[in-house]
Every structure is written in C-alpha cells, then in structure tokens.
C-alpha cells in the first residue's frame, strides 16, 4: 500500500511539473505568434485548466463526514453552499477587498496543501531530510498567486476579467513583485542547501510560470494542473474505495475514483457562471469572471473544511 501510494504521488507530481512546463512553453509560443495582448487563446486554456481543478473540492463532504447520517450530510452541504453563496455576494459587492481576501486565503491554502502533499510522500520515503516549511509554504503559495497579478501583463488580464481589480495592489505592485520573487529565490537556495532538489525544482517551475505565462494562464494552470491534482492524490488516502484500489495496485482507478464524484460540481459551476454571465455584454469575459468568482467563493468553505486534512498530513 505505502509503496503504491508513493508511486501514485510521484506520478501526479510529474504530471503537475510537466503540465506547468508545457503551459510556460505554450505561453511563450502563442504570445510570440498572436501577441501577448490576444486574450482568446488565454481564456480558452484558462477555462480548460479551471475545469480540471474544480472537481477536487467537491469531495469535502466525503472526507469530513465519511459515514454520517443523511440528515447530517445534507446539513453540511447546505451550510457549505450557503457559505459559498455569501462569499460570491461579498466578492461581487466588494470587488477589490473580496479579491484581496481571496488572494491571501488562496496563497495560504495552496502553500500548506503543497507542503502536505510532499509530507505524505516523505512518509513513504526513506532518508529524506525534513522539509523546511517556513520557506517552502510561503514560496509555494504566494508565488503562483501574487506574482502573476503584479507583473507587466496583469493590467490587460485583470481588465478582461474585471476592470475594478486593475489597481487592487494600490500602487505597491513593484514591491510585491520584488519581495515575493526574492523570497522564492531564497527558498530555492534553502531547498538546495537541504538537498531537497525536487522541491527546489518545484519552486523554480512555479517561479517561471508566474513570470513568463500570462496571468490568467498562470493562475488557472497552477490551480487545475498543480494544486488540484496534488490535493486529489491526497484524497485517495482518505476514501475507502481509493485505498482499496491503491492496495491492489490499480493506481489510475484510485485517482479516477477521487475525481468522478466531483464532476457534478464542475457542471454546476459552469451552469451557475453561465447564468450569472448572461446579463453581461461580452459573454466570454463575463463568463470567465463569474467562473472565477464561483471558484474563489468555493475556496472559502473548502479551505475551512480541508484544514483538518492538512493538519493530519503535516504531522
């Protein structure tokens, strides 16, 4: 079981690294051919990447209340959805403030989630020096979230999503870019010093994604192909059917069994986003903005629910 789980985790890790690397390469090619100001190809790639990531948060009830009574499960889902709805209203009503709050929540959640993924892998490996979380967590979380939103390409991206967010940083864009970049470079140095070369590679790839890919692609690809994939791998250790699959060596089936139950959430997210966007002038831009709002809103209850899972993985 432990050896098979390690194989699954390493495959997912390779997938996330390759996906982000391809996103960087694709961004460079398309930016050169179509221009960095062309948004159509960016929105298409971003929507696909977001679609890959949305199902991972739809299994929170199965992990939190694995054997609960139907009434308790229904109550949990109602409260979960209610919190998300309140978050949607908050983000739409207070665009900038809500955006900043979600950014910090996402950065913290992403960093802790990545460290938890690595710790689960470390538990199944021998002779590995303990990960320096004080450097890895902030670097892994803040790099893919903040850098894409303060670099030179962020203005056009934010304008296409919601013009009200363009100046969210209140003029401190250069300081944020410098601080996060320097800290991540320092964290990479710490990883190399500790001989955590794979973690150093992870941070290098994330730093390149944040600096070289358009903001929409940087966030969406990270969310869907990195964070969501690694979170789903961790879910396979908590879902009985997945554990059974892993024990039997059926790793693909184990992973798919952690994804399929979340597909209705994917459909629901795009249906809700589409309905909210119907009143907009530009369907593509309005739809994408509403899809992001729904995803960000779901982060609020999702982060609260997965805190227990993260805490267990980090101990």
Question: Would you name each region that the model predicts?
Answer:
Residues 104-108, 113-116, 132-155, 173-189, ...:
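Alpha-helical transmembrane segments of multi-pass integral membrane proteins
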Residues 66-74, 78, 85-147, 160-163:
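Membrane-interface helix-loop-helix junctions at boundaries between adjacent transmembrane segments
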Residues 1-20, 131-132, 259:
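N-terminal membrane topogenic signal
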Residues 113-118, 213, 222-254, 259:
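Predominantly late transmembrane helices and immediately cytosolic-facing juxtamembrane segments
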Residues 50-55, 103-116, 225-235, 297-301:
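Alpha-helical transmembrane segments and their membrane-interface exit regions
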Residues 23-27, 79-88, 182-187, 200-209:
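Hydrophobic, membrane-inserted alpha-helices
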Residues 26-40, 279-283:
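Short, hydrophobic transmembrane alpha-helix segments
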Residues 3, 55-66, 110-122, 185-195, ...:
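C-terminal ends of transmembrane helices
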